[in-house]
Structure formats: structure tokens, C-alpha cells
């Protein structure tokens, strides 16, 4: 029987300068219909007063633990929080987003009903405050392999950790420690999914990711934004080599190459990325044949591959005028 001595869910929250968005985030956490949770708020060197805000939240609510560290990045903050987690389940979310009021309850019940190690819902971007009225549906059980393929290819799942509830011990602090600041959450998810035998997908917008005014597709990018993502994709490809996930991972890797090239082509100043762009072009040429015959690449992505390979000027125009951000 569940006792109140141990929280049912530990919610780990890296906090770095969320500003005005922290209060609505905290309200959405405290409005959860499942109330037996522990929140570990890890201040990652905030400079906007958030350190004081999380201390105040911890004084007002005994379920909240405030932790402080020098700025080390979201991955390090998550790892710090996960190491302190006491719950039977674990969820990592961001301090400027919102959760559906039934998110925790629905994901926990899905795990319990299917004896699953993982449950996840849709990851939904928003600009206006979303409606909380949607009723969570029954979950769809999946094998661990199907969940990993979904992670790589299904945009409903997204790469983020925020919409994924794990049983304690599946996602570990060591999995979260890595040298990358971009797609580090994808790498952690991929590693954790390897320990999953059964997962459950709930097809509803349970997690709402706030879209800020400045988007990567409309502002300058820095080289590590691209090189970190390429490094993470290579690690996933290497990890899948020789397994039943190899073909799926190869398709994912090719899609990532196309995405990274598209990000370079969206920039008005591209000279900084010339060396990386040459590397991407070479890998795109090498993988083109397999990509065009892959069952894991959709028609739209194959069309992008054709444009990139056969008519680069048109591909460049498409990237500049039509494409949107995709993590």
C-alpha cells in the first residue's frame, strides 16, 4: 500500500532564469490532481531572482526541496535532482512550462495498470495558456523497442524528458551526465529507454512547452547547437549498430543530417559553419541511397533528401522560406 512517507512521484525541475513564467509553472504543479509528489527545484545559478523564489516556494510547501548550484547547464541540474529523488516514479520538467492537471495521475495510473517502466504523453508547444479540459485517454501499451523507435521518429513524443514518467531507477543521474548542452535530453531518454520492457503512450496533450518569442529558426545559432546534436545522433547510431534498431537509427541519423543542414541554410551568415556543412554534405551523399529505401523515413523527408541531393538551390530556398524549428 502507498504511504505518505514516500512520495509517489519525484518531479525534478532545473531552474535557470524562468522569470515571470515560474509562478504559472509552480501553480500547474500544485494543481495536479495527484497530490502525493515531491518537487526538487534545482537553481542552476539564476540571476533573475529565481533562487529566492524557489526558497520561498519550499518554505510555503513541504513537498518542495530547493537546491542551489553554480551555473552548470540543465543536464547537470537534472542529475543533481535525480540523485535526490525519493519517489516511486520520476519526472523531469522545465520551470517555464505547464502541465495538464491530470498529467501525473494519468501517467502513474498507466504505469501501474500495465506494470510498465515508462509512460508518456504528447509534448505540445504553446504560446497562449492551454485549456485544461481534455480528459486523458486510456494508454496504448508498447514494447521497449517500439518506444525507442517512437522516440526517434514520432514528433508526438519529442526528444525532451518532460513528458516521460519513469519508474525509479530507470532514468539515473549517470545517464543525465554528459558534455552536451543540446539534445542532451534525447541522449538521456535513449539511454533510459534501453532499460524499458513495457511502455505506455497516452495520446493527449499532457505537457505544454512554452514557446518564447525568440526562436532558433528566426535568430542566429551558435556552432555547438549543431555539433552537439550531431554528436548525440552519432552516439545513438553507434549504440544501435548490429541490433534490431539499426535501420531505424540510420534513418533517424539521416533525418538529423538534413535538419542540421537546413539550420545552416536558414542563416544569413553561414561562413562560420562551412567546415561542418561540408561534413554534412558528404554524409548526406553517402547515406542517400539507403535513406531513399528506408521504411522509417516518410515521404516528406525523402522529398527533402531529394531536394538536398539533386537541386540544392531549391532546397536552400525551402529552408529559408518554409521550414520551422524542430529540436
Predicted regions and their residues:
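Short, well-formed alpha-helical segments that are part of the catalytic scaffolds
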Residues: 17-31, 53
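A conserved acidic beta->alpha catalytic loop
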Residues: 28, 35, 43-52, 70
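Glycine-rich, basic loop-to-helix element that forms the pyrophosphate-binding segment
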Residues: 69-85
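Short aromatic/hydrophobic "clamp" motif used to bind/position activated sugar donors
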Residues: 90
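Conserved donor NDP-sugar-binding/catalytic core segment of glycosyltransferases
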Residues: 102-134
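Conserved nucleotide-sugar donor-binding catalytic segment
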Residues: 146-222, 226-229
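Catalytic core of nucleotide-sugar-dependent glycosyltransferases
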Residues: 206-212, 219-245, 259-262, 266-288
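Membrane-interface aromatic/basic loop that binds lipid-linked glycans or pyrophosphate carriers
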Residues: 266-327
Amino acid at each position: 500500500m502507498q504511504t505518505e512517507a514516500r512520495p509517489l512521484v519525484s518531479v525534478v525541475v532545473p531552474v535557470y532564469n524562468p522569470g515571470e513564467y515560474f509562478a504559472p509553472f509552480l501553480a500547474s504543479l500544485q494543481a495536479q490532481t495527484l497530490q502525493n509528489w515531491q518537487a526538487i527545484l534545482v537553481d542552476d545559478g539564476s540571476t533573475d531572482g529565481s533562487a529566492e523564489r524557489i526558497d520561498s516556494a519550499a518554505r510555503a510547501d513541504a513537498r518542495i526541496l530547493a537546491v542551489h548550484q553554480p551555473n552548470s547547464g540543465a543536464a547537470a541540474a537534472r542529475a543533481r535532482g535525480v540523485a535526490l529523488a525519493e519517489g516511486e516514479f520520476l519526472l523531469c520538467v522545465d520551470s517555464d512550462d505547464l502541465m495538464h492537471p491530470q498529467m501525473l495521475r494519468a501517467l502513474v495510473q498507466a504505469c501501474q495498470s500495465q506494470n510498465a517502466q515508462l509512460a508518456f504523453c504528447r509534448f505540445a508547444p504553446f504560446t497562449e495558456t492551454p485549456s485544461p479540459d481534455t480528459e486523458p485517454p486510456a494508454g496504448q501499451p508498447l514494447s521497449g523497442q517500439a518506444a525507442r523507435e517512437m522516440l526517434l521518429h514520432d514528433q508526438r513524443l519529442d526528444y525532451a524528458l518532460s513528458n516521460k514518467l519513469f519508474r525509479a531507477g530507470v532514468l539515473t543521474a549517470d545517464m543525465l551526465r554528459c558534455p552536451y548542452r543540446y539534445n542532451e535530453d534525447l541522449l538521456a531518454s535513449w539511454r533510459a529507454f534501453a532499460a524499458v520492457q513495457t511502455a505506455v503512450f497516452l495520446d493527449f496533450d499532457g505537457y505544454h512547452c512554452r514557446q518564447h518569442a525568440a526562436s532558433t529558426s528566426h535568430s542566429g545559432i551558435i556552432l555547438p547547437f549543431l555539433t552537439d546534436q550531431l554528436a548525440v545522433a552519432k552516439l545513438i547510431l553507434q549504440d544501435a549498430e548490429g541490433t534490431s534498431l539499426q535501420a531505424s537509427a540510420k534513418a533517424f541519423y539521416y533525418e538529423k543530417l538534413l535538419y542540421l543542414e537546413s539550420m545552416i541554410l536558414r542563416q544569413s551568415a553561414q561562413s562560420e559553419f562551412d567546415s561542418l556543412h561540408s561534413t554534412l554534405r558528404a554524409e548526406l551523399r553517402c547515406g542517400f541511397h539507403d535513406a531513399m529505401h528506408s521504411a522509417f523515413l516518410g515521404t516528406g523527408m525523402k522529398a527533402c533528401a531529394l531536394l538536398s541531393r539533386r537541386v540544392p538551390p531549391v532546397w536552400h530556398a525551402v529552408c529559408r522560406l518554409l521550414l520551422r524549428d524542430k529540436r
